[in-house]
């Protein structure tokens, strides 16, 4: 299917029964690119904001979990994890209408805070799942040595722990970024049709008859989602280029 999208995006004419397009052209990309600037910017901004909020909440959750474990205080986090996973288990359409009604009552429908919040509902579980193993496997002895050498727990957290966990954090954010990009129904319901994202535009174009334009929109959506993963790969390699162990 990916190969078909790539061929359609550069096809000038492709008629039955030809196996490949008879003519190729890049004109399919020239016109839609101007129309894609707003959907791309809206999608990227909403995804970045929801990912940043998600990573802050998830890191705070794990830190609280570890603090309770060190203090040997009984935690209900394991028993309440199902709350985080609910958006993954329940069909979106079954509770999005309720969220929309609440936002309408409080006059928040079609606003940026509402859009970011509803994306956060779906981004948070994926960020939590992808970061859980790496964060819980972190060797606390690094932090103990850091507190001995360079100062208090807050300074050690930012200068040692977060740096050592930078790559898994970036990858979990990349997953969340891709999840946010893919949201269609939440954007349509909560955004009240006021936010044109790359996904809503792609679905709208897909209902038309021009497969060439549809392929351009679909590939653009794919490339935007891949940007997050490329950043998660390239950024640690560039920042820690003199520290080979930090790149793995």
Where are these regions (language model features)?
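Membrane-water interface segments at the C-terminal ends of transmembrane alpha-helices
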Residues: 1-15, 30-136, 164, 168-185, ...
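Glycine-rich helix-loop "coupling/hinge" segments at transmembrane-helix boundaries
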Residues: 17-22, 184-212, 244-248
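Luminal/periplasmic active-site loops of membrane-embedded glycosylation enzymes
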Residues: 20-32
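Short helix-to-coil transition segments within interhelical loops
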Residues: 68-72, 138-166
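Residues in the helix-turn-helix
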Residues: 94, 155-156, 197
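Membrane-helix interface/capping residues of multi-pass secondary transporters
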Residues: 112, 142, 151-153, 184, ...
């Amino acid at each position: 299917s990916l190969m078909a999208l790539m061929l359609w995006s550069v096809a000038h004419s492709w008629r039955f029964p030809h196996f490949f397009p008879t003519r190729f052209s890049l004109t399919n990309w020239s016109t839609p690119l101007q129309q894609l600037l707003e959907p791309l910017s809206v999608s990227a901004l909403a995804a970045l904001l929801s990912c940043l909020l998600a990573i802050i909440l998830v890191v705070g959750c794990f830190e609280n979990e570890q603090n309770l474990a060190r203090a040997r205080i009984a935690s209900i986090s394991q028993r309440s994890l199902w709350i985080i996973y609910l958006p993954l288990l329940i069909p979106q359409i079954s509770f999005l209408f309720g969220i929309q009604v609440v936002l309408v009552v409080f006059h928040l429908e079609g606003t940026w805070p509402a859009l970011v919040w509803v994306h956060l509902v779906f981004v948070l579980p994926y960020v939590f799942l992808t970061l859980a193993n790496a964060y819980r496997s972190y060797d606390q002895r690094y932090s103990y040595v850091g507190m001995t050498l360079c100062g208090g727990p807050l300074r050690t957290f930012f200068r040692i722990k977060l740096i050592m966990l930078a790559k898994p954090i970036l990858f979990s954010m990349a997953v969340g970024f891709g999840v946010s990009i893919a949201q269609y129904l939440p954007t349509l319901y909560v955004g009240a049709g006021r936010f044109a994202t790359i996904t809503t535009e792609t679905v709208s174009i897909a209902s038309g008859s021009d497969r060439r334009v549809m392929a351009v929109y679909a590939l653009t959506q794919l490339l935007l989602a891949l940007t997050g993963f490329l950043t998660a790969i390239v950024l640690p390699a560039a920042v820690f280029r003199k520290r080979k162990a930090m790149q793995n």
